[in-house]
């Protein structure tokens, strides 16, 4: 096959083609052309995938027209390359050659395409034009080209999947936030001022931490790109980027030390300017974010030597950019970058001043702040803390006026005289009780004392006097009621009251026992006197006459008993005398007060018939016989074991049991009459 003839426009003069410099130049340009072609091939595949979803199909006529345009553009580029250049151009191309990797990755290839363009107009047109140039060749692919195409497509799929995963990754949480709210205590925990001992180590760590955060893309490639690229295109891109970075700098944490701010600002300025050319010209914002994330991952994996080299290069580039002659776009850049730097300085100074001026909070303030935070969250303590109680105690103490020594002494003297007076009155009452003074006089003195001094009820002696006033014949319930009232009033000391009540109860039991013994002795003495009188007379009496007389006497007693019962049914008020004298000494005849359901029904009938009834209660009154010995023992039993129906020894005690409006129905006791009848038969 014969090689195609070279057009005359592209041929060099024969005198220049033989030179070694031009041969080296052609070899270098051929390498650059092949590399550009490979990168544009991958870019074309990506554009084909995107255009297949909605773009139009390029016809054959359009391809021919675009091919002619590409040839014309190629001739123009060749003419420009043959023009004379300054000596520094070769060095720049060498640096670009070393910096650009041969891997066909999307990020670096796209960046090289954008960087190597010289005019803003051509930068938008070159990708489409060069892609159309390769279209006729793509129809006849060799095996190596097909292999490279497959590898590039696989790599593109991997990169797109990674980019999607990075986009789906959750965002980094805001520092100091807890459940959607920013907590001041969490911010203070990682922004407290460091101690003097750890200043050097902390400063080095923070410098190394802030530099990789700021350098998102690789600075070596972009720095060479800024030197090679045209000034007008670079300055327009950087002016756009400063407006975006000024918003992002507000989110970055302010510098911790003021003396590091100058160096950090210069480094950040250079890095932001160099990284602007890569990120802004890419196209949509989504690609910018993806490229910045991939660049961050590459920067984190780099070694410490690479970081130091990047720092030095960025500083040199920053100094060169500042030293360049000022143009219109450069003036705009400096005007926009200066307020950003001023904001950084002011934010850093304000943060340092606020930390230095902020005093160390006390434990009480911290607790109060914690309580406020808990109240805001809806967490309230069930029991109030002890600190609240301790704060109120001194206030109450301060409210009480502190009296002088003499006033307190006078108050103590008055209190002592007061207690002595009360004790004297109680002792006088006790003496009167022991002497046998009437109950009414002692009650008058006690009531007068309580009227004048109501607090005297809290003394036990008052209740002791009331218990001793009660006669020995009074029931035990009255004394127990006095004891209960003393407990309710809070009398002190209650032990003394308990001892006195025990003494009173023992006295009552002894009195009852003595009375029973005296009655038995008197009865026994009477019987002995009768026996002695019968023996002394010595008169012979017929036993038959004695039996007849005794029978006659018993019959009379039985008749009298029946008459008495009849009289009781007719008019119970006539029976005033107690039947104790008519019975023997070992037994007692008492009246039992009880009710029955039948009696209650009768009462309801009577009340229904007579609306204006004079009585309210209706009870039975039955004479019963009780043993004297058992009666004495049952009196000592508690109320639960005693007989529920009370027994009365006389009619006078009925007024104490019931009301005046109560009515009693007397019914005879056949058992008492039967006793007399049995005695008669024997």
UniProtKB/Swiss-Prot annotation:
Key word Cytoplasm present: yes
Q: Partners and quaternary state?
A: Associates with alpha- and beta-tubulins.
Biased composition, Polar residues: where in the chain? 218-251, 261-278, 291-305
Q: Which residues carry this modification: Phosphothreonine?
A: 578, 581, 595-596
What the record says about family reads: Belongs to the CKAP2 family.
Q: Which PANTHER family match?
A: CYTOSKELETON ASSOCIATED PROTEIN 2-RELATED, CYTOSKELETON-ASSOCIATED PROTEIN 2
Instruction: Report the protein's function.
Output: Possesses microtubule stabilizing properties. Involved in regulating aneuploidy, cell cycling, and cell death in a p53/TP53-dependent manner.
Q: What domain of life is recorded for the organism?
A: Eukaryota
InterPro entries named in the record: CKAP2_C, CKAP2_fam
**Where Phosphoserine occurs along the chain?**
177, 189, 533, 594, 601
> Lineage of this protein's species?
Eukaryota, Metazoa, Chordata, Craniata, Vertebrata
Keywords, A to Z? Apoptosis, Cell cycle, Cytoplasm, Cytoskeleton, Microtubule, Phosphoprotein
Identify the GO cellular component terms for this protein.
Answer: cytoplasm; microtubule
User: Any idea where this protein resides?
Assistant: Cytoplasm, Cytoskeleton
Which BP terms from GO are recorded?
A: apoptotic process; negative regulation of microtubule depolymerization
| Region of interest: Disordered | 1-28, 152-174, 208-305, 326-402, 557-581
Q: Which organism is it from?
A: Pongo abelii
Q: What is this protein called?
A: Cytoskeleton-associated protein 2
Basic and acidic residues bias: start-end ranges: 332-344, 361-375, 560-577
PTM annotation (Phosphotyrosine): residues: 598
- Pfam families for the chain: CKAP2_C (PF15297)
């Amino acid at each position: 096959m014969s090689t195609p003839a070279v057009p005359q426009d592209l041929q060099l003069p024969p005198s220049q083609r033989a030179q070694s410099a031009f041969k080296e130049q052609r070899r270098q340009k051929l390498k650059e052309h092949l590399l550009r072609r490979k990168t544009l091939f991958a870019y074309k595949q990506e554009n084909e995938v995107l255009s297949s979803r909605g773009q139009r199909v390029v016809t054959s006529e359009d391809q021919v027209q675009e091919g002619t345009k590409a040839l014309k553009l190629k001739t123009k580029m060749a003419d420009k390359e043959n023009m004379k250049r300054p000596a520094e151009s070769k060095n720049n191309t060498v640096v670009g050659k070393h910096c650009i990797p041969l891997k066909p990755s999307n990020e670096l290839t796209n960046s090289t395409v954008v960087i190597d363009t010289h005019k803003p107009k051509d930068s938008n047109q070159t990708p489409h034009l060069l892609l159309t140039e390769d279209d006729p060749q793509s129809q006849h692919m060799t095996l190596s080209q097909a292999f490279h195409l497959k590898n590039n497509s696989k790599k593109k799929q991997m990169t797109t999947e990674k980019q999607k995963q990075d986009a789906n990754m959750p965002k980094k949480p805001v520092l100091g936030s807890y459940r959607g709210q920013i907590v001041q205590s969490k911010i203070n925990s990682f922004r407290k001022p460091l101690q003097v001992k750890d200043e050097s180590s902390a400063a080095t760590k923070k410098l190394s931490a802030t530099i990789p955060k700021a350098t998102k893309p690789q600075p070596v490639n972009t720095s060479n790109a800024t030197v090679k690229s045209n000034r007008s295109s670079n300055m327009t891109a950087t002016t756009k980027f400063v407006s975006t970075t000024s918003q992002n700098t507000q989110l970055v944490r302010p510098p911790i030390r003021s003396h590091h701010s100058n160096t950090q600002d210069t480094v950040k300025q250079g890095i932001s300017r160099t990284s602007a050319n890569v990120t802004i010209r890419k196209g949509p914002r989504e690609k910018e974010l993806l490229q910045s994330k991939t660049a961050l991952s590459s920067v984190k994996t780099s070694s410490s030597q690479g970081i130091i080299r990047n720092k030095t290069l960025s500083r040199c580039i920053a100094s060169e950019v500042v030293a360049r002659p000022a143009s219109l776009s450069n003036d705009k850049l400096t005007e926009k970058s200066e307020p950003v730097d001023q904001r950084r300085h002011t934010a850093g100074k304000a943060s340092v001043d606020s930390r230095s001026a902020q005093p160390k909070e006390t434990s009480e303030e911290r607790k109060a702040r914690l309580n406020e935070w808990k109240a805001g969250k809806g967490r309230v303590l069930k029991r109030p803390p002890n600190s609240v109680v301790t704060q109120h105690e001194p206030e109450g103490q301060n409210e009480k006026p502190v009296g002088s020594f003499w006033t307190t002494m006078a108050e103590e003297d008055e209190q002592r005289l007061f207690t002595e007076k009360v004790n004297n009155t109680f002792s006088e009452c006790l003496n009167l009780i022991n002497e046998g003074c009437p109950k009414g006089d002692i009650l008058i003195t006690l009531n007068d004392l309580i009227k004048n001094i109501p607090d005297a009820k809290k003394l036990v002696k008052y209740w002791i006097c009331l218990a001793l006033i009660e006669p020995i014949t009074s029931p035990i319930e009255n004394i127990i009621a006095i004891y209960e009232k003393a407990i309710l009033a809070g009398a002190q000391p209650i032990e003394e009251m308990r001892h006195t009540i025990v003494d009173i109860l023992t006295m009552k039991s002894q009195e009852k026992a003595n009375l029973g013994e005296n009655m038995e002795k008197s009865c026994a003495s009477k019987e002995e006197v009768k026996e002695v009188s019968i023996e002394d007379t010595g008169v012979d009496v017929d036993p038959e006459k004695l039996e007849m007389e005794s029978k006659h006497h018993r019959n009379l007693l039985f008749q009298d008993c029946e008459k008495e019962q009849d009289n009781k049914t007719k008019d119970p008020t006539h029976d005033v005398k107690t039947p104790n004298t008519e019975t023997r000494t070992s037994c007692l005849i008492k009246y039992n007060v009880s009710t029955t359901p039948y009696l209650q029904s009768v009462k309801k009938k009577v009340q229904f018939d007579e609306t204006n009834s004079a009585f309210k209660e209706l009870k039975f009154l039955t004479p019963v016989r009780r043993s004297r010995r058992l009666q004495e023992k049952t009196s000592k039993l508690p109320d639960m074991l005693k007989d529920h129906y009370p027994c009365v020894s006389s009619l006078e005690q009925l007024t104490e049991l019931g009301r005046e409006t109560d009515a009693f129905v007397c019914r005879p006791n056949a058992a008492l009459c039967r006793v007399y009848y049995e005695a008669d038969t024997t």
